[in-house]
């Protein structure tokens, strides 16, 4: 099953320096999740500080569990919106 995960950096509670110091670990963990097929695609958001991820997982619980292993998430620096996706019916016969 696929999910869209929208993240928002909690910039009202954390400084840019606090985010910057964790970037190498965040990137490393995101690469590991990508390598195992959990993260399918990832983009930076253009509207606010955060990211948009296309995720492959069995359940929303699993999505939250694995995203919770990101260093920003472990530090409480992110908010997540998780949207379950289903196939577009317009492309079905």
Model-identified regions with their sequence ranges:
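Conserved, structured core segments of small domains
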Residues: 1-93
């Amino acid at each position: 099953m696929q999910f869209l995960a929208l993240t928002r950096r909690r910039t009202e509670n954390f400084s840019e320096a606090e985010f910057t110091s964790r970037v190498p670990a965040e990137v490393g963990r995101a690469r590991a999740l990508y390598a195992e097929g959990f993260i399918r695609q990832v983009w930076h958001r253009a509207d606010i500080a955060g990211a948009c991820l296309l995720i492959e997982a069995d359940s929303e619980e699993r999505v939250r569990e694995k995203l919770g292993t990101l260093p920003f998430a472990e530090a409480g620096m992110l908010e997540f919106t998780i949207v379950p996706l289903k196939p577009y019916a317009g492309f079905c016969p």
